[in-house]
A protein has these predicted regions:
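N-terminal targeting signals for Sec/Tat export/insertion, comprising classic cleavable signal peptides
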Residues: 33-67
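A broad helix-preferring feature
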Residues: 14-21, 159-163, 211
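Hydrophobic alpha-helix-in-membranes signature
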Residues: 20, 29, 119-122, 157, ...
Length: 222
């Protein structure tokens, strides 16, 4: 949260400096965007080898996002977005060390609303629906077990995300934005172990991210 406060402060300060006579706002019409993010998955519950109620802890990760959008005249923006996230498992039940990598590859259709106040700084909120592919790999295992049971695997579930942030129109064609996201899946993910009869089930995926992005608008004046 400290990182988000710093980014929002910088963006707001830049908006005050940019709020000159032109008072730039983003152009209407199509745009491209790309961003880089910090990702932190909170503790997630799962069932391992028939034992329910096990919690998993995760190290901080990162994310990438890119896509195309359209800015409508009444504050609505619609987007088609691809995003990818990477995180690393740390422990189960805060005590047992684990090793392995989790990847989230997602395609989302987003709808967002810009609160426009004749200012280059614009708050926005929105959300999206799509598909999440969750993949575990790099020998997802207990590293102290010899030989280990490997839980590598992947599957796809419907996904959702909520978004809130601020954007700064540097010019009508270029804007930068910072936003916070909560993202998850409908349903659970299951991973079969390399040893018959062993598996991880009922993994409920949800994560939190902070993204900084750049938008390029192809339209003229707003």
């Amino acid at each position: 949260m400290r990182t988000l406060q710093i980014l929002v402060g910088l963006l707001a300060g830049a908006g005050l400096l940019a709020a000159g006579p032109a008072r730039a706002q983003s152009a209407l019409g199509p745009y491209l965007f790309a961003g880089l993010g910090y990702d932190q998955m909170p503790d997630r519950n799962l069932t391992i080898n028939g034992r329910p109620g096990v919690s998993s802890q995760w190290k901080p990760g990162y994310g990438l996002a890119a896509g195309v959008g359209y800015k409508w005249f009444f504050g609505l923006r619609t987007e088609a977005e691809y995003s990818g996230r990477v995180s690393w498992v740390k422990t189960f039940n805060n005590t047992n060390p684990w090793a392995g990598t989790a990847w989230d590859n997602s395609v989302m259709m987003n709808a967002l609303y810009d609160f426009e106040f004749d200012s280059p700084v614009t708050p926005f909120i929105g959300g999206g629906l799509g598909l999440n592919q969750i993949q575990w790999g790099n020998n997802f295992r207990v590293p102290t077990q010899n030989p280990p049971t490997i839980y590598d695997g992947e599957s796809i579930r419907p996904g959702w995300q909520g978004i809130a942030g601020l954007s700064l129109a540097v010019t009508p064609q270029i804007a930068v934005a910072v936003d916070g996201r909560v993202k998850g899946s409908f349903g659970h993910f299951n991973f079969a172990g390399s040893v018959p009869g062993k598996s991880i089930n009922q993994f409920n995926y949800e994560t939190r991210s902070i993204f900084v992005s750049v938008r390029y608008f192809f339209g003229g004046q707003p």
